[in-house]
């Protein structure tokens, strides 16, 4: 029996708002002492009333537009009722039947080919508190930190259009890239700002028979998503072949063991007893609202990747490296400033030397200390023959440390190459006179000897000889007949 794997994803992403979803508490809780970013609304105290965060709504709509969703003019919030220690009110304010965004799609690349996954909905809700599990003196405790409670959260639900663990990983990476480009989420999985539950099932390749799905939780990295889905794919297929009965369930991924385990029976919408949130008004969105939000959107990653290849003549891999992050793509375009002839050199410098500097210092391109105009200046100094490529690479670190323009550093440190032919010709003649053996070797056919002679010329000028000019003058002198 031949199987086809069917995968759908439910992705949660925290929004980068200053305040929480329904109150004025700071949403930036990272590193804060437990239970310090809280108020009566966060804690679900009786009598407290929520107020909608307008910016969170705008960010959700922007995400929906980027994913090609339809934005209904009317939306509302609902109460999702369930009891859990991380939910102080006993319900979560979410959206049920009238979400902000519906019927979209995301295109991404798999082995260089476009794949399209439909987006069922994007809705807005509040995050829950965080549970911290500890064991002290043999006793187990679960502590509750309410700082995360009420942070704006979007849930992006796909249709079951994915068919392999690798596709699921690539989709998630592309989705996170879009969210980061929009500036609506950090997308940092290690901080819980980008989380995913994966639904996976099996069906026959002809679609005539399909088995119940399993929802996998505890996926805290892209690698975990791919590994967990690969394990569950094999587990389900093996169970079917053995004639076992599969049930719809929620399973947890155990990273250290590389397996999924049963947690509970899968919930259904009726289990949550959704009903409209009575303390919040509905949301009405006009065409003017959508036009304003659309006007604030940047060019999206896939479109920019394609444009870089067409406009700047870059290869797919170069364009992918440059467009992986919006800040890097912006830096590249600011450096090139419309001059296509600089594109290749700028791409090489950014993906080579500048990326190496960023890795060394553990920072992003906006913190590395080099401005786009400074990198362009460095490239132009090399192209004009003012400095060598080696000197330019050394200067890049100095620019990063001091913020000083390359032209100023070249002047201050006397790094300009000697390109004057009269001056170089005199030194060439002296070097040839002082090294008759190397000259004889070259004239006997040992052309590698010119490297030694070039080194002597460079040494005489403290490494500032223009290598191209010096080599040409050496070759001309060596080809002269012996007197």
Swiss-Prot record:
Leader sequence segment: none
Keyword Protease tagged: no
E.C. no: 6.3.5.-
GO biological process, one term: translation
Catalytic activity: L-glutamyl-tRNA(Gln) + L-glutamine + ATP + H2O = L-glutaminyl-tRNA(Gln) + L-glutamate + ADP + phosphate + H(+); L-aspartyl-tRNA(Asn) + L-glutamine + ATP + H2O = L-asparaginyl-tRNA(Asn) + L-glutamate + ADP + phosphate + 2 H(+)
Family: Belongs to the GatB/GatE family. GatB subfamily.
Purpose of the protein: Allows the formation of correctly charged Asn-tRNA(Asn) or Gln-tRNA(Gln) through the transamidation of misacylated Asp-tRNA(Asn) or Glu-tRNA(Gln) in organisms which lack either or both of asparaginyl-tRNA or glutaminyl-tRNA synthetases. The reaction takes place in the presence of glutamine and ATP through an activated phospho-Asp-tRNA(Asn) or phospho-Glu-tRNA(Gln).
Protein name, per record: Aspartyl/glutamyl-tRNA(Asn/Gln) amidotransferase subunit B
Gene label: gatB
